[in-house]
Curated annotation (Swiss-Prot):
Keyword DNA damage applies: yes
GO terms for MF: alkylbase DNA N-glycosylase activity; DNA binding
GO BP, one annotated term: base-excision repair
E.C. code: 3.2.2.-
UniProt lineage: Bacteria, Bacillati, Bacillota, Clostridia, Eubacteriales
Name the record gives this protein: Putative 3-methyladenine DNA glycosylase
SUPFAM superfamilies the UniProt entry points to: FMT C-terminal domain-like
Organism expressing this protein natively: Clostridium botulinum (strain Hall / ATCC 3502 / NCTC 13319 / Type A)
Length: 203
């Protein structure tokens, strides 16, 4: 069963933890790719200098952040990569959760082809570990791009999160990655990951 709007309608820090262990589903050419969410980061526009919406900043690019909970916010970085976020709390609040890493579960060969243009069995150990262990890596592997920006995970048939009951794990809370510019916000312990999971991007 997919997660509903009510599930997403909560503080981004709470949602970021509760998404761990849930399963992201992405349909590509009629094939469903599945991956367990193992690492997330929370962003809260009102108080978070690392957020694209800090201080109420509102542009065409950041408009999805102000959307309904459960909306996808997909943005472009470094001129070639995408990052995938899910909006939380309440419409107009500009809170969201970055999906940082997945553990591949189903149709791993297609995931591998999308990521490396190779069958999974052809990958070396380094490639296998890095197949979905980072926000842009998982977007490549699950074919998530600007076409998915604004997509409603509560209604979409091709991108959503399943309420699968994987909860036998310990959650690590630590600092977020790549936000040294964000002054005091760089020290917020708003990154969450499943302890000892091999697909976490940074430990």
């Amino acid at each position: 069963m997919r997660l509903t709007r009510d599930f997403y309608a909560k503080d981004a820090r709470v949602l970021a933890k509760e998404l761990l262990g849930k399963v992201l589903v992405r349909e590509v050419d009629g094939i469903k790719l599945k991956g367990k969410i193992v690492e997330t980061e929370a962003y809260i526009g009102a108080i978070d200098k690392a957020s694209h919406a800090y201080g109420g900043r509102r542009t065409k690019r950041t408009e999805p952040l102000y959307g309904k909970p459960g909306i996808a916010y997909v943005y472009f970085i470094y001129g070639k990569y995408f990052c995938f976020n899910i909006i939380s709390k309440t419409e107009g609040e500009a809170e969201g959760v970055l999906i940082r890493a997945l553990e591949p579960l189903e149709n791993i060969n297609l995931i591998s082809k999308l990521r490396f243009n190779k069958e999974f069995e052809e990958l070396n150990n380094y490639q296998r570990k890095n197949i979905t262990s980072g926000p842009s890596k998982l977007c490549m592997a699950f074919n998530i791009n600007r076409d998915n920006n604004w997509e409603d995970l509560c209604e979409s048939s091709s991108l959503y999160v399943e309420d699968v009951f994987y909860n036998d794990f310990e959650i690590i809370e630590t600092v977020r990655v790549g936000i040294d510019y964000a002054e005091e916000a760089r020290d917020f312990l708003w990154r969450y990951y499943i302890k000892d999971n091999a697909f976490v991007s940074v430990k």
